[in-house]
Amino acid sequence: MEELKRIITEFRAKRDWGEYDTLERFSKSISIEAAELLEHFQWEESGDNIQEIKDELADVLIYSLAMCYHLGEDPKEIIKEKLKDVARRYPEKR
């Protein structure tokens, strides 16, 4: 995860994209990219172009991770906390 953080942070810094770093803009960008991902399934249940799906998924992940870094939060910890909460609400069935 640290390598990914470095890659994303450096990529954005080299393009001076930091001026756009607000929670609102990250949220909008995540939503827009998620909608673009969903378009691949709008008329069919299985997306035909896996590479395009991967590209849109990467966009969602990049914006999500960049938002975590902007907040000063560790994405792994955010995910672990959420899974603990979900596990309490939805116990295992096995």
Model regions and ranges:
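Flexible "arm" and connector segments at domain edges
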Residues: 1-57, 61-94
